[in-house]
Every structure is written in C-alpha cells, then in structure tokens.
C-alpha cells in the first residue's frame, strides 16, 4: 500500500504524524539503501533522481539526529559539494535549496557557474548570476567553457552580462573553432574579436578537426589568414575538402619542400595525395620521402599510387622496404619486392629489424626471398632473443641460425632479459649448460630485474652458479635480490668470493636485508 503513494504525499503524511521513521517504509526512498554497497553517494543519487522532497526530509531527519541518516554515507558531502553536483546535473531547484541552506555559490573560485556553463544548464546559470556569482573569475573561464561545449544561449547570456570573450589569449574563439561551433564563432566575431587580428590559430584548430564551415567563415573574415600551417594540418589529417578550399584561397601546397604530400602519404590519405599530385606537388621531394613514409606506416594503396606516378622505391638504399619490414607491413613488403626492391640492402637491414620487432610473417617472407639470416653474426636471432619473440627464434633456428654464435650469446641474451621460454627452447636444441663456460646464472642476476625463475631453471639443469668468480651471487647481492641470494647460497654459492664482494656491494647499495643474510652465512663486512 505504501508504495502506491507518491513520495510527495507520503512525506506529507509523515510530516503530519511527525513519525519520520515511516519514511523508510516507502520503496522510493528505502531503495536508496540498496546503493550503499555500490559506493554510490546517497545524496548524489537523490539529486540525480530529482527527489527534492526526499532531500528535505533527509535534512530534517539529520536535524532530529535520526540514527539511520547519521551514518557516513549520508554525511560525506559538504553543502558546497552538493551545490556543485546540482549545478552539474542542472537541478535548479536543488541549487536554490542548497544555497538557502548556506552553500556558497562563489566557493572554489566560482566553481558552481563553471559547472553549469560546461554542462549547458542555462536556468542554473541565470540563477547564479542573479545571486552574485562572478562570471569573470579565472580569466572568464565560464564563457570559455560554454564556447568549448557549444552552449550558444549561455554564451549570449554571459556576453550580455559582461563576460570578456578575448580573455586568456582569445581562448573562447579558439575552443569554439576547435570544436566546430560555427554559430558561436560568428557571435564571438560579431561581439568584438578583431577581424584584422591573427585568425591563424583558430583556423588551424578548426582545420585539424575537419570543421570546414568554420574554416571558410574565419578565412572570409581576415585577409591575414594565410598561414600555410593550416593546409599542412588539413593534409596531415586527411580533410580533403578543407585542403581543396585552402588551396583555392591561395595556400601554398608545396610549402616546406612539398611537406603536404609527404605527411598525407605517411598518414594514408589517398584522396589528398591524388589532389596534391594533380596540383603539382612533387612526390619525389626529400629523396622520395612520400613513398617511404607511406611504406613505413603500411599504406599499400598510397604506395601503389605513388609508384604509379614515378616514385622511386629504391631511394636511400631501399628505405621503403626496410621500413615496411621493420614495422611488419607484409603486403607492402611483398608489393615493393615485386617492384624490384632489394631486401638485402644495408647488410640485410630488413630481416634484422623484422626479427627484432617480432614480425614473423615478414621474416618468413624475406627468408623465402633470399634474406641472409646469418648476417652480422646471426644478428636476426640475437635481436629476436633480446625482445622475446619466440616464434621468430624458432623459425630462424629451424632455418639455420646458430644458437652457439659468439660463445652462446643467444642464451646469454635470453637469460639476461628474462625470456624463459626462449631459453628453454634454445637449450632444447642441444645445449648442455652444465659443460659450457658461460655464466648464464650470473647474467640472470644482473641489473634491477633479477630473473629468479630463470635462475632456478638454469640451476635445475646443471648450470654452474660459481662461474666467473661467483658472478651470480655477487650480482644478485649488488642489486638487492634477496630471494636469489638465498637460493644461490642454498645451492653452494660462495658468499666470500672476490674478497667479500657480495656483501660490500650490497652494503654500498643499501640492501640491508641482503647484508644481514650474508653476515649470517659467514660473509665479512670490513
């Protein structure tokens, strides 16, 4: 029965009977308690749901020291914070109520009106202005944020009340332009933004985000708007209609050695590239950077178009195929090879960096086309081990890479960089770590990492922890790896090796727990 009554009637009954605890028998109110476990603030929820009568009764219950509403979840917001939430939500009746209870509309540098302007609540803005809020605080932030968010009626109101639209380096028109609010831009110009002043920054911001109408309007307002940064930004972001418009108004499409076509190519904007070519841009400027950038970023259609227009894919020692390989763009790599690119230029750069970056498909393709995987002392394998690319490692080894190169350097690299899976694979290919004179355990202890799992694995398969004058415990101690130090000692490491190097370095680096442990095991700190 209780739930059939609207909250307003129910609260009036409670007021008449003066029995406030009955309020909690109505589910419209009582359901608020279900929010406690979700960490939603009760008062914020009341404001959000516009239950002003409930808010008033909560306050009445607080006044009467009611046990339930004295709990923390009813009391963790200040009056000013309640005001801010109301302004953000546009609950003008709540705003008035909290102000009547003592909330300060000018607190936190007039934060209330900033929230109302940001979220477009004009009635709240009007009320706050009528009650003395400072609309010009923080360099007229209120009008700036209203411009930024496109709230035109609020912008008009604030201007009519004296807001300075040119404050903060003309930020209002910049933000409006950046976000494409053409009508606000027009108002700002009509209200005092000097049409002979520098329009370039608002134009560039509008260009960047593709707001053609704003660009057209601003350019029409100033003969000084000739900054060629605008057309570069349009080309960079692929806004073809803006590129065409700016070109028609005299912007230099060939600025900075045809940078426009280079950046458009690099970002994959084919239609922009075609337009710029039709207007005379040189696709081969800066030693064919256009096709190189397109290849680097994997834009196959742009690469194909540029090649059809005469771009040289072999410029700068086949940089196009090298960069495409390095970044894993297999289709671009295949196309460039089909057009005569040399994959082996600069000491097989392509396969070395494809391996380093883990691009297995590219590596497999390059090898199928004759790339030398043994180049530079098995550099592809070493790079793959360094970065932890197990698939590439397996492929290279299966294709003839030498896991014993440079005194087992692949194993050292894997151990020293924490790549346990690669280390296990390399060992499985016929390496007996118990007989090789390589300090694998010591390498795993180096630097700030300390790869305990690798240390345990190596010891479990017979690696010598005492190699290189007990390098393992010396480094583990120096870098503060207490768990590794204990494990090594338990497995026979000499804590006094190299004239007590371990404890001296642990002490010097401030690893007191390691020092204490080593002392307990017989080390001497002199």
Swiss-Prot record:
InterPro entries: Ankyrin_rpt, Ankyrin_rpt-contain_sf, SecEffector_AnkRepeat. SMART domains: ANK. The lineage of its organism: Viruses, Varidnaviria, Bamfordvirae, Nucleocytoviricota, Megaviricetes. SUPFAM superfamilies: Ankyrin repeat. It holds the Pfam family Ank. Keywords: ANK repeat, Repeat. This is Putative ankyrin repeat protein R840. ANK repeats lie at residues 78-107, 108-137, 139-167, 169-197, 198-227, 229-255, 256-285, 286-315, 317-345, 346-375, 376-405, 406-435, 437-467, 468-497, 499-526.
């Amino acid at each position: 029965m209780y739930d059939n009554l609207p909250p307003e009637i129910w609260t009036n009954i409670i007021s008449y009977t003066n029995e406030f605890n009955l309020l909690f028998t109505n589910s419209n109110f009582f359901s608020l308690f279900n929010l406690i476990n979700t960490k939603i603030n009760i008062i914020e929820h009341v404001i959000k749901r516009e239950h002003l009568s409930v808010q008033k009764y909560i306050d009445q219950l607080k006044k009467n020291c009611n046990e339930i509403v004295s709990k923390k979840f009813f009391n963790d917001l200040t009056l000013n914070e309640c005001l801010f939430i109301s302004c953000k939500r546009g609950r003008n009746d709540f705003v008035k109520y909290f102000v009547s209870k003592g909330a300060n509309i000018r607190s936190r540098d007039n934060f209330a009106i900033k929230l109302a302007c940001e979220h477009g609540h004009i009635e709240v803005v009007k009320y706050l202005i009528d009650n003395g809020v400072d609309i010009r605080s923080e360099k007229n932030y209120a009008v700036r944020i209203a411009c930024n968010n496109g709230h035109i009626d609020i912008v008009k109101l604030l201007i009519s009340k004296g807001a300075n639209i040119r404050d903060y380096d003309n930020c209002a028109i910049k933000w409006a332009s950046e976000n494409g609010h053409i009508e606000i831009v027009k108002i700002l110009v009509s209200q005092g933004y000097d049409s002979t002043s520098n329009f370039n920054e608002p134009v560039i911001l509008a260009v960047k985000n593709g707001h053609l109408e704003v660009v057209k309007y601003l350019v029409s307002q100033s003969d000084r708007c000739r900054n060629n940064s605008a057309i570069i930004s349009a080309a960079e972001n692929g806004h073809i209609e803006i590129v065409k418009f700016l070109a028609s108004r005299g912007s230099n499409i060939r600025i900075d050695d045809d940078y426009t076509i280079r950046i458009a190519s690099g970002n994959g904007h084919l239609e922009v590239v075609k337009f710029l070519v039709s207007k005379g841009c040189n696709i081969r400027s800066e030693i064919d950077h256009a096709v190189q950038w397109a290849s680097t970023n994997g834009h196959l259609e742009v690469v194909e178009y540029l090649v059809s227009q005469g771009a040289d894919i072999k410029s700068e020692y086949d940089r196009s195929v090298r960069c495409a390989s390095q970044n894993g763009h297999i289709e671009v790599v295949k196309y460039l090879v089909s057009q005569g690119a040399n994959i082996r230029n600069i000491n097989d750069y392509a396969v070395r960096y494809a391996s380093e970056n883990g691009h297995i498909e590219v590596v497999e393709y390059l090898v199928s086309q004759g790339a030398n995987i043994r180049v530079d002392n098995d550099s592809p394998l070493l790079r793959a081990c360094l970065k932890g690319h197990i698939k590439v490692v397996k492929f290279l080894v299966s294709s003839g890479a030498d896991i014993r190169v440079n005194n087992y350097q692949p194993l050292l690299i894997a151990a020293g960089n924490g790549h346990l899976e690669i280390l296990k694979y390399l060992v499985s290919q016929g390496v007996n770590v118990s007989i090789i004179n390589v300090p694998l355990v010591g390498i795993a202890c180096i630097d700030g990492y300390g790869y305990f799992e690798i240390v345990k694995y190596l010891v479990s398969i017979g690696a010598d922890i005492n190699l290189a004058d007990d390098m393992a415990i010396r480094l583990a101690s120096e870098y503060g790896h207490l768990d590794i130090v204990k494990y090594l000692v338990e497995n026979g490491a000499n804590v006094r090796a190299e004239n007590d190097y371990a404890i001296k370095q642990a002490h010097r680096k401030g690893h007191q727990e390691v020092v204490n442990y080593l002392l307990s095991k017989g080390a001497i700190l002199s």
